[in-house]
Regions:
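Hydrophobic transmembrane alpha-helices and immediately adjacent juxtamembrane helices
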Residues: 1-272
Length: 272
């Protein structure tokens, strides 16, 4: 364990330093995310104001507001830029430096991201989550229930990030074949945002569509952890959702290993 820590600590430090160095860029992107959350809030407010019902698909306006907030936080903590990093490093040729290091290829990206994720969690995720927990307790929910859901949310959040990371690693490996992933990365991000429930809760889709999307790995990224913290899942649904997350994590890890063995023969160094 000590040897592993010493080997990957520089990557963790690099992730932290990168976030600190480009903090203005990070803040500007987050402002854009917050503006998007406000747009979503007012769209849903208009929907509820025009509806005769106080509940739509089991959601009240308060539930939707909490969903929007936690979707923003969860997206921030589970997103992975590994496919973008691989694509850029393949394009400019710097991928050779990573390949020459005596470390696991995917793990080097993982620990770099973990460095930045830890900083984001402390500075953004924890304050938001603390406020949500406090509001839930003050609204009359039992302390043990709220704390239990929070722990389950954090566990689900961890699984969600790992699924997303290895999915992006798999996608990023295609850069060794196609050489440029800029356009396809943007398309991938948009599709995943839609299918993960980040924009619209999957419960609002037609039943058959909702069931299909709920089984796919993308629902595990945003929808599952957010539904847990919002309190829309009972104990059996939480267990089922967590088992599905475990399943997709195993699939993504296995798939990443398989694809990596296949694409190594396509490695060519560009740039100079």
């Amino acid at each position: 364990m000590v040897k592993l820590w010493r080997r990957y600590k520089p990557f963790i430090n690099a992730g932290i330093q990168e976030l600190i160095t480009y903090r203005v860029n990070f803040i500007l992107y987050r402002i854009g995310d917050v503006m998007g959350a406000f747009v979503a809030f007012y769209l849903w407010k208009a929907v509820f104001d025009s509806s005769q019902e106080s509940l739509i698909q089991g959601f009240s306006m308060a539930d939707i507001t909490l969903y929007i907030i936690m979707s923003f936080v969860t997206n921030l903590l589970t997103r992975s830029d590994s496919s973008f990093m691989i694509g850029e490093e393949v394009k400019d040729g710097s991928i050779i430096m990573r390949l020459l290091r005596p470390v696991h290829f995917a793990a080097s990206y993982l620990f770099t991201e973990l460095g930045s994720k830890w900083l984001i969690f402390i500075s953004v995720g924890l304050p938001f989550l603390s406020v949500i927990v406090l509001i839930k307790i003050l609204s009359g929910q039992g302390i043990l229930e709220v704390l239990g859901l929070t722990v389950l949310y954090l566990f689900s959040l961890t699984l969600a990030y790992l699924i997303n990371f290895f999915f992006n690693i798999c996608f990023g490996f295609s850069a060794f074949v196609f050489k440029n992933l800029w356009g396809s990365n943007l398309l991938k991000t948009s599709i995943v945002a839609f299918m993960s429930g980040s924009l619209i809760p999957l419960a609002f889709f037609p039943k058959i569509v909702s069931e299909i999307l709920s089984f796919l790995p993308f629902s595990s990224l945003i929808y599952t952890p957010v539904m847990i913290i919002v309190g829309k899942y009972d104990a059996s649904q939480i267990l089922k959702a967590l088992l599905l997350q475990f399943f997709w994590l195993i699939v993504m890890v296995g798939l990443s290993q398989l694809i990596w063995k296949r694409v190594q023969s396509f490695i060519t160094i560009q740039g100079g």
